[in-house]
Amino acid sequence: MIRNAALAVVLALVSAQAVATSDPLVGLLEGEGSAGLGAAVRIEPSMYKDAGVQYDLLPLLLYENNYVYLHGYRLGLKLQDTPETLIDAFVSHRFEGFPYDKLPASLAGMAGRDTGTDFGLSFERRGAWGAAFVELLHDVSGASSGSEARLGYFYEWQRSRMRTRAYGALAWRDATLNNYYYGVLPGEATATRPAYEPGSGMNVDFGVYADYRLTERWRLLGGLSITQWSKGVADSPIVSGGTQLKALAGFAYDFSPEKGAWKEKGRPIDVKLMYGKSTDCNLLPAMALQCTSTSTVDNTRIAGIELGRPFLEGMHGWPVDIVGNVGAIYHDENGLQQNAWAVHADMKAFYYGFPWDAHVRTRLGFGFGLSYAFRVPFVEARDQAERGRPTSKLLVYLDPTIDVSVGDLFGSRKLHDTYLGVGASHRSGVFGSSQLLGNVNGGSNYIYTYVQWRM
């Protein structure tokens, strides 16, 4: 239950001073109510023998206000935030473990080690000399159930358009954490792989991260770090060595509202109600309206509500609006498994530059974000089981739609911002390229109708 609540919060929706530690996404956004979207690639040699180099695609959904921050894989609640002190509680993804379907010879016959979700508390003290921080973390996902404590320091400087941050940290990991990820159980032992427990130990981390402001809204980001693992982990029969290098490179777009936007009436809220059915159609044919059948054997359904806040209107002078959304979708599994909720957050672009726009506003929309299902939907579990592949509660969320203004159709000015439309609710594992998403290669599609209005 704790795991579900923590991950659900992650999807709810970063300040320049929001997070201490080695997080490379600190400071990408500026201002209250800012949001951003981007992608990054993590590159690191696997700690496991003969497992090669791991490339992990990270979808970046970013949000900041005075109380919470989201960095794609880390969300925090700011308990105290002053120029000198930051205290926050957070949940974050742990990038460790190995999947069930891509085991090197050194891990053959071993049970998979799941990635984890940590709940943590952080204290940071700032000054002209830099910042010192302490973090306490504990796995709440039921994967390792291990704990970690970090003590570190970072210094940040700005030069022209580039902001750079160097850091160092000590990380003490308890035996439960190390034994889970780098130990060998007695039942997994072989002639060349003895049973082993690394026990607790201290890691040493150093790194440098930077982001470059290409334009007012586009950002490039990158970083390098090195970790010296404890001797207990380094000596494990399934570990390739005690030193690990990591690299990260990516980009982000800042959708922060322009200064003065909506200052007279405040930023409005969009409300959307939706209902739909599962489909065997792939996403692209469904988007092109070449496949719209919802006649399936399972006959599962969805119903949901979504709330949106506009961030940009007429972006760059184009007929494009940007809206940030959070929503909840109820999955009716038609008795095939227990019904359950899923929550999502996304940034969505609406294009309305059609020749007939002055008469009947028509919008093409495309949303990109993250979805967390409290129970993996039946259609995903079934399809992945048939292929012998893992499932994940956390996946990328895509939301292509087309709608028309009800007010324009019926000549009602009051209903101009009320829309009737059709869309496809799609959960995707991004072709198995993301450890954050459980290395899932697959997903689910639901075709739905909706009504949306502005408050």
Language-model regions: role of each:
Residues 58-62, 153, 243-270, 443-455:
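Outer-membrane beta-barrel "beta-signal"
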Residues 1-36, 50, 190, 196-201, ...:
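Cleavable N-terminal export/targeting peptides
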Residues 140-233, 238-241, 311, 336-441, ...:
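Outer-membrane beta-barrel transmembrane domain signature
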Residues 41-47, 65-67, 91-97, 127-129, ...:
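Transmembrane beta-strands of outer-membrane beta-barrel pores
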Residues 21-34, 67-84, 129, 158-164, ...:
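Short loop/turn motifs that connect adjacent beta-strands in outer-membrane beta-barrel proteins
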Residues 46-53, 79-81, 112-116, 138-148, ...:
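Solvent-exposed loop/turn segments connecting transmembrane beta-strands
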Residues 37-45, 68-76, 104-108, 130-140, ...:
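Transmembrane beta-strand segments that form the barrel wall of outer-membrane beta-barrel proteins
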Residues 33-39, 59, 68-70, 85-89, ...:
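Transmembrane beta-strands of outer-membrane beta-barrel proteins
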